[in-house]
Amino acid sequence: MNYILIGLISYFCGAIPFSYLLPKLRKIDIRRTGSGNVGGTNALRAAGPVIGFICMVLDGVKAFVPVLVFSLIFKDIHYTGISSIFAVLGHDFPVFLRFKGGKGVASTTGVFFALCPICGFTFLATWISITLLTKYVSLASIVGMYAASFVAFFFNKDYGVLFLLLSTLSTLRHSENIERLVNKSERKTDLIKIIKKRG
C-alpha cells in the first residue's frame, strides 16, 4: 500500500505542468510554440529567460520535494526509487495534459539534488559548460545526467543505479534530438543571447 501511495503522490507532484502554466501568463501555448515540448528549454525560447528559468526551477522542485520527503521518512531505497521514478514519469506523462509532457531533465535534476546534492551540482556545471560551448541543450542535458550518475556511484551505488535509470529514460525521450544531433540539424540555443535580448 505504501508503494502505491508514494507512487501516486509523487506522480501527481511531477505532473504539475509548470512549463505549460507559466507561459500561459503571456498567452503562449507552449505545446504549439517552438519544439512543442512542455519543458523548460522550450519555455525559455518561447517565453523568455525569466519565465523559462522559473519553469526549469519549478520542474525540478516538483520532483525534489516528494523525493526528499519520502527519503527522509522511510530511509529505504525502494521507497526512494518509487518516488523518484514516478515523479519523473509525472513530468514526462502528465495526466493534466493528456500524458504529453517534457523530457524529464529538470525533474531528474530535482531528484539529483534531493538525494545527492553534489550530483545535482555536477549536472548543472556540465549542462552550463556544454550549452555555452556547443549551444546544444539536448547534448548538454544528456551528458550532464550521465555525469551526475557516474559521480553518484562514488557515494551510493543504489543512487547511482537509480540515476542511471532516470538518465536512460530521459535519453529515450531525447531520441529525436539525438537523431538531429547526428544529422547536424539540431536547433542551437544561445543562452547569453536570449538573456541579453529578452531579459
Curated annotation (Swiss-Prot):
Keyword Cell inner membrane: yes
Top-level taxon of origin: Bacteria
Catalysed reaction equations from the record: an acyl phosphate + sn-glycerol 3-phosphate = a 1-acyl-sn-glycero-3-phosphate + phosphate
Sequence intervals crossing the membrane: 3-23, 50-70, 77-97, 110-130, 136-156
GO molecular function: acyl-phosphate glycerol-3-phosphate acyltransferase activity
UniProt record, GO biological process: phospholipid biosynthetic process
Record pathway: Lipid metabolism; phospholipid metabolism
An example Gene Ontology CC term for this record: plasma membrane
Protein function: Catalyzes the transfer of an acyl group from acyl-phosphate (acyl-PO(4)) to glycerol-3-phosphate (G3P) to form lysophosphatidic acid (LPA). This enzyme utilizes acyl-phosphate as fatty acyl donor, but not acyl-CoA or acyl-ACP.
Protein name, per record: Glycerol-3-phosphate acyltransferase
Organism: Pseudothermotoga lettingae (strain ATCC BAA-301 / DSM 14385 / NBRC 107922 / TMO)
Phylogenetic placement of the source organism: Bacteria, Thermotogati, Thermotogota, Thermotogae, Thermotogales
